[in-house]
Amino acid sequence: SVTRYAALMRGLPWSVSAHAKDIWTSEPWEAAEKLADCAWAVTCTNMGAEQLRALSPRPDKVKLVYHGLDFAHLPAPAHLRARRDGSDAADPVVILSIGRKVEKKGFGDLLDALALLPKTLHWRFEHIGAGELGDMLKAQAERLGIAERCTWLGAQPQKQVFAALARADLFVLASKKAADGDQDGLPNVLMEAAHQGLSIVSTRAAAIGEFIEDGDNGLLVPPGASEALAAALARMIGHPDLRQQFAHRAAETVRTRFSFDAGVDWIASALGEDVRREARAAE
């Protein structure tokens, strides 16, 4: 809104980037008004692009530009991962999740799923991220009898995040739509986990299916379905070969479809054209 008002005051064109919450919790009339007024808009998922195009009088203004990863600034992935299969109590499978402790991340559903895992499987869960539901989630883990297996690391610097990705065996994100309509787009952490060589279990929420294809480069279950999530986790825990297969395919998907460079190049080109157009108009 501030950019739009400043542009109107100066008589300049303006552009906008929409992500997730701003798409799904904004009033449709407000989004439509801004889309009619801007020069162009970008968003980071096809699902979001379709929503904005439906609201825009000029659907061609809305472009899909995935965030992607800047591979040059990421640590090299681990070449060898432990082949834990959950059979050794002294060497449990490490399950990692990263994200804010808020409703749309589905951590309550994930704890329910972990509690449903077969007693014969040995695992431990690590979580990275801050958030308003921290105390509630810890209390839930206590009630479910899994608190001793759960480590809540809180917010961590990037170096520690990638260290956690390196030591984990499996990444899980149980995203869902929150009661207020907020939902994820395509969480970057999924692409980061894949780049680091981790296999992924997630949900069909939001735009996750634009990256993870169930049964090809990971496993997806319906959002909020703790029993299905537990079954997918158990399958991954007990089959290190399957984890390796999915991890390899997910990493290839990241490398071939989700490079940071393509999106930056498009945005730079569009901004450059706007500047040149204004310069010609001022002559």
Predicted regions and their residues:
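Acidic anion/phosphate-binding donor-loop and adjacent secondary structure
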Residues: S26-E30, R53, L69-G86, A90-D91
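Carbohydrate-associated surface elements
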Residues: M47, G68
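Conserved donor-binding/catalytic core segment of Leloir-type glycosyltransferases
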Residues: G86-K105, L111-L114, E126
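Acidic donor-binding loop of glycosyltransferase active sites
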Residues: A166-G181, L198
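Short hydrophobic beta-strand element within catalytic cores of glycosyltransferases
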Residues: L190-H195, S199-S202, I212
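Short acidic/histidine- and often glycine-rich active-site loop of Leloir-type glycosyltransferases
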Residues: S202-G215, L219-L220
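Conserved acidic donor-binding segment of nucleotide-sugar-dependent glycosyltransferases
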Residues: D214-G215, L219-S226, R235-D241
